[in-house]
């Protein structure tokens, strides 16, 4: 999105994407526990070879994701007003940001749903499926972005629409893969399990620490963009590009996080404590090495 709007006739588009994306990040990143929590519970069920719990972990998380996504869509006006309260951007930036926000907000159920599916696939020791779906989402997003912006002349609205379409394509692709590839598990789906309130309590309790960690992380990135808006639209645009480099680095480290979630849960479920100890030590060594290298 940032690359496409960067070639339009105003830096205000870059600033608008930065502001709108920061608002979305503040919302969605706080739901990242859907992916991390789901992968952990699923990996433990995988290690214990408990297909019923593998199905239950997906169902619980997916219900939470779709419910939260729908609520976000319903509260979009309030969220947008609250978001603009923290950003002192120019009028043009706010107008473009609002146009982008009002279209892309409808992707909320698909985005949170993908958090759940990604976490579940990783917990099932299947990292390839999320990777291929992510590649597909980005290819479709780029193609539609170029078409809507340069052919249909829709500018920032075209960018938002392209992202919206790509997210739903990714969600339904994940649903299709799950239905066809994991038939031995999906037959254990029982909606009566949704009445198990204690299971939901455990899910939220375990993920409370992740939520606190995410709040701290999002607060830093939001503060960075908020301060940038006070320095003018040019500084906002430049800092928005710098933030993309920070996010790019985080993707490298996410590989270790995915491995940790999948393998740690698997070894805990299988009660293989020695392998768990070896895994934790190696993850810390590789994580520190990569961090030092990038620094």
Where are these regions (language model features)?
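Membrane-water interface regions at transmembrane-helix termini and the short interhelical loops
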Residues: 117-125, 145-157
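Short alpha-helical transmembrane segments in multi-pass integral membrane proteins
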Residues: 42-109, 151-208, 264-295
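Small-residue-rich hydrophobic transmembrane alpha-helices
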Residues: 14-73, 111-130, 225, 238-295
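Transmembrane alpha-helix boundary and packing residues in multipass membrane permease domains
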Residues: 2-3, 40, 81-82, 119, ...
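Helix-terminus/linker motif at the lipid-water interface of multi-pass membrane proteins
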Residues: 1-15, 84-91, 147-154, 215-248, ...
